[in-house]
Each structure stands twice: as C-alpha cells, then as structure tokens.
UniProtKB/Swiss-Prot annotation:
EC code: 2.1.1.74
Any Pfam family: GIDA
Originating species: Thermotoga neapolitana (strain ATCC 49049 / DSM 4359 / NBRC 107923 / NS-E)
Disulfide bonds: none
Name of this chain's protein: Methylenetetrahydrofolate--tRNA-(uracil-5-)-methyltransferase TrmFO
Substrates-to-products reaction catalysed: uridine(54) in tRNA + (6R)-5,10-methylene-5,6,7,8-tetrahydrofolate + NADH + H(+) = 5-methyluridine(54) in tRNA + (6S)-5,6,7,8-tetrahydrofolate + NAD(+); uridine(54) in tRNA + (6R)-5,10-methylene-5,6,7,8-tetrahydrofolate + NADPH + H(+) = 5-methyluridine(54) in tRNA + (6S)-5,6,7,8-tetrahydrofolate + NADP(+)
Length: 435
C-alpha cells in the first residue's frame, strides 16, 4: 500500500522520512514551487517561514524536553538541525536555507518516496491512507474540499514574522555581542537610552499597519504578538518584553542599558540577522522608518521585511480521534500546525507521532497513545480531549504535564523531575512498543 502525504513542511517531512526509511512506499504531494503560498519563498521541504530558532535544548525547558523525546523516537528535523545550526546561545537555531535544502535532499534520495509537485484539491478518503500536513497556509482549493470532508469551517489566528537585516549594515561601534547573564556571545545587542527608547516607542505606536481582511486583535497568537501591538499596550511594555535589558551589560558603560534590541544570526556565514521579537504587520516603508530609530540600525539594509499572515487550523477535538485520524474517515490523518499544535517542534513532533501509528496500522497492530507523562503525549492529549469550546493553538509547556506525586516548591527542581519522569516514560514506552 502507498501512503499519501500532502504537504512537505516540518510535519510532512517527518512523516515521509520515518515511513520511508522503514520500507513503506510513500507518495508525497507538494505544490511548491509550482504554486507558492503567501509566506513561502522556495520550493524546499521544511522551509521555515518565521524565526530560524527551534528554541531551547535544555530539558528543564518545555521545548528542550520536547526535542529530547523527539530524538528518542527519531527525528530528521533535529538530525538536520544539528548539521546546519548557527550560534544562538542555549537555543537551537539553524541556517534556514541550508536546513531546508538538506531536508529536501534527504527525502529526494529516499528510494521508497515518490514526489509529486502538484497541488491537491481533492482525494478519495476511502482509497488508501492519506495524511494531510499542509500547515497554516493550506491552499484555497484544498481548503474547500477539506471543509466539505470535515463538515465544518476552519478556525484561524494571525501570526507575524520579523524583519532581517544585513550584518554589514549594522553599526557595530555601538552594538555589543553577548547573551543574557554572560552565557555566551551569540547575539548582537543594540542598546537604547531612555530617550532613544521613547522615540522608538512613539514611532511604533504612530506607524501605519497593513490592513488585513477579518483581522481581530483577539486572534493574535500570544507568542507572536506584533511589536506595534505590544507597544500600544503601554509605554514600558516593550522594555519588559522583547526589549528587556535584563542580564545584558553594555561593555562601554558597564551597566544594563535602558532597553535592548537583540539580533539573532540567520545563516552560518553570519551575513544576515533577524530582529528578535520584532514580528510586525507595519507597512514596509514604516518598518524602515521604525528600524532606523534604533541607533545601531540607522543605516540598516533590510533584506526581508516583516509580514503578517492568517494561519488556519481544524477544530481537532471535534473531528479527530486520539491518533489524529478523522472520526468520520479513519484512513485520513492530520499532522502539523493544521491540527492546532503551535510551533516548529510541536508540528514536527506531531508528524513523528502520526508516522509511528500509521506504521503500526500497516503492520496490523493497533495505534497507541504516548504516555501522558511525556511532553508529546500531554500535548496531543490536550489538543484532542482537554479543550472546552473552540481549540486555541497550544505549544509545549510544563503546565500540560500531570503533577508530580510529591510537591516540589523549587521551580527548576520541579521541572527537572518532570523532565526525568517524561524521558523515563518515553524510554519505557519505546522499549515495550518499538517502531
């Protein structure tokens, strides 16, 4: 039997890789580059359209624990991320082009994988296994078909990305290298005095935004709030948010600046840097004016402007079973952000989970849920079963995990124990139920 996968994002790539390497015949449909979305720039698989950061690798951080579990199950995304990483302190960040190019090469070289560069606008859910991993920018043609298949409309939220500037245009005479609390030198820090900060804040709140159809501030995703929306919530909101100076000492003064704009490397050569926390929907001309209010970026060359886009997803608790199959059509699976998980790693992890159970089904075995003590198990359980009302996108966090049997007051120690329990549960699960 051929397994059909629609969409070669992070989730789709994990599905294809994990099935293909186990001898399963896979037909992968990807419409890019023949038909592009409003946010993609290339035809590569696993293209990163927002940040180039996969966040923390420490297991006492929810994102780090999620990665540890993914590695235990097997993840092509993390394998390639290790090979294409760029310096980013305690976070795992990648050269976005090298990363996507390598994932594409690996999948293209797989003998069991047939790649079809065409848009899918419909399919027969009763013929074979179908895995929909088309992400938040699913094409209108397929959306129409899926609405009919699901019998209900999609949910959506708004997301935004940050601008990227060239390194050679940054004024390094004022900027300084460093991570918070002296834990590395991977970020470029652009310090602001109180006067400079207030000038930047004023420019942000007065800047014109690009109007969007159906735009609603309540539908902005909390971890990707546009910088201008944060600014409008109060004069000091940015200074206690993405521009907080905590743990960053300017070597010129020996003190923490009033505020700091951080820049994160985008590529291995260090030619391009993104503005951390500067997701925006400002008009492009306004973005340039605002960025030039930052002294270190007065002459900045903007190589990619920030944009906002609408992300769609299904109401998973209503339409999916615990294995991410359609309740109406058990041979149709969903994976990735279209299910309501939020984040790069969360999307990739859902692809691994779907691939695991599809492989079991193909071998005549029953699908299995992951232990709820694991971050993956708890996240997927939440998405499917633990939501009241309409689903809101959810990312990995320790609040999803069942509490420890004993109360631990110290936050770090509590997270450490939760992580140890999660990894033990995943290890035992995979020993008992290997791929």
């Amino acid at each position: 039997m051929v397994v059909n996968v629609i969409g070669a994002g992070l989730a789709g790539s994990e599905v294809v890789y994990n099935l293909g390497k186990r001898g399963v015949k896979v037909r992968l449909y990807e419409m890019r580059p023949k038909k592009m979305t409003e946010v993609h720039k290339t035809g590569y698989f696993a293209e990163l359209v927002c940040s180039n950061s996969f966040k923390s690798e420490e297991v006492t951080n929810a994102e780090g624990l999620l990665k540890a579990e993914m590695k235990m199950m097997g993840s092509v995304v993390l394998e390639v991320a290790e090979r294409t990483r760029v310096p980013s302190g305690k976070a795992l960040a990648v050269d976005r082009n090298a990363f996507a190019r390598k994932v594409t090469e690996i999948i293209e070289d797989m003998e069991n994988v047939e790649i079809v560069r065409e848009e899918v606008t419909s399919f027969n859910p009763d013929e074979g296994i179908w895995i929909v991993a088309t992400g938040p920018a699913t094409s209108e043609g397929l959306l129409s078909f899926l609405k009919e298949l699901l019998g209900e409309d999609f949910l959506f939220f708004f997301d935004a990305v940050s601008p990227i500037v060239s390194f050679e245009s940054i004024d390094m005479s004022r900027a300084f290298w460093g991570d918070r609390f002296g834990k590395g030198n991977d970020y470029i820090n652009c310090p602001l005095t109180q006067e400079e900060y207030e000038e930047l804040w004023k420019a942000l709140v007065e800047a014109e935004v690009i109007e969007m159809e159906d735009f609603d501030r309540s539908l902005l995703f909390e971890r990707c709030q546009p910088v201008e929306e944060i600014a409008r919530s109060g004069k000091d909101a940015l200074r206690y948010g993405p521009l907080r100076p905590t743990g960053l000492v300017d070597p010129r003064t020996g003190k923490e600046p009033y505020a700091v704009v951080q820049l994160r490397r985008e590529d291995k050569e260090g030619k391009f840097y993104s503005l951390v926390g500067f997701q925006t929907r400002l008009k492009w001309g306004e973005q340039k004016k605002v960025i030039q209010k930052i002294p270190c970026l007065r002459n900045a060359e903007i190589v990619r402007y920030g944009v906002m886009h609408r992300n769609i997803y299904i109401n998973s608790p209503r339409v999916l079973d615990p294995f991410f199959r359609l309740k109406k059509h058990p041979s149709v699976f969903f994976a990735g952000q279209i299910t309501g998980v939020e984040g790069y790693m969360e999307s990739a992890a859902s692809g691994i989970y779907v691939a695991y159970n599809v492989y079991r089904i193909l071998r005549g075995l029953s699908p299995l849920r992951l232990p709820e003590e694991t971050m993956m198990g708890a996240l997927f359980s939440y998405i499917i079963e633990k939501v009241e009302g309409d689903l809101k996108p959810m990312y990995a966090n320790f609040g999803l995990l069942p509490p420890l049997s004993v109360r631990v007051r110290n936050k770090f120690e509590r997270r450490k124990r939760l992580a140890e329990r999660a990894m033990k549960a995943m290890r035992e699960f995979l020993e008992k139920n290997p791929w």
